[in-house]
């Protein structure tokens, strides 16, 4: 049984299954390729919100993963209305959260930040639809894990993605924006969020021995930055950068709390 801190509180049991992991049609909601979903569900189940906004809700897996009755509303650009959602709207979240949605105890955005054209404006919109002290949870690919840094020598940084075949219209799989821990820490902080935490994802870390070697250099640099940090907040950021999840993990799951002092 694992313990982790979520917005300053210790939660228990985040390595346990929060549901059967099976959708109503028999397919797996949270298989090994979607381990980030288990982590996101764990964070929410520890917080026990009464209302949640699921941004880019896809197949509606979240409503089946929550351990207690929760009102879940959803937004998606491509998917149709999933079962179990109280309110759903097809919308382009590049334009922000539609005004028809209210304010929530929590919001999530899984595997969608890399598609955004205006991430700062998006976070401002999310903030407007969260109650004070509400939690925002997001997941996205980790662009800077040890193995990726080798690939950067070939494809550059940000990477020259091979699936870019046209630039005339949006497609379901056309991520372009490379956001890592440090960029998210900055963006979330600038938009009124605090208590920014990286959460463990159940994945093999590292996957290759070469990554472990590179990781030694990454961790040595992070330890040096912790010692020279100009503030406690910056030192905490580098401590999270030192974690195996950030150094070796393919996924990032990050939570942040909306400060009660943040302007709507």
Task: Map each language-model feature to its residues.
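A short SAM/SAH-binding and catalytic strip from SAM-dependent methyltransferases
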Residues: 106-118
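S-adenosyl-L-methionine-dependent methyltransferase catalytic module, highlighting the catalytic core
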Residues: 117-128, 135-259
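Short, surface-exposed alpha-helical recognition segments that flank or form part
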Residues: 27-31, 114, 172-175
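Conserved N-terminal segment of class I S-adenosyl-L-methionine
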Residues: 1-102, 106, 120-123, 200-225, ...
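Glycine-rich nucleotide phosphate-binding loop and flanking beta-alpha elements
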Residues: 59, 114, 144
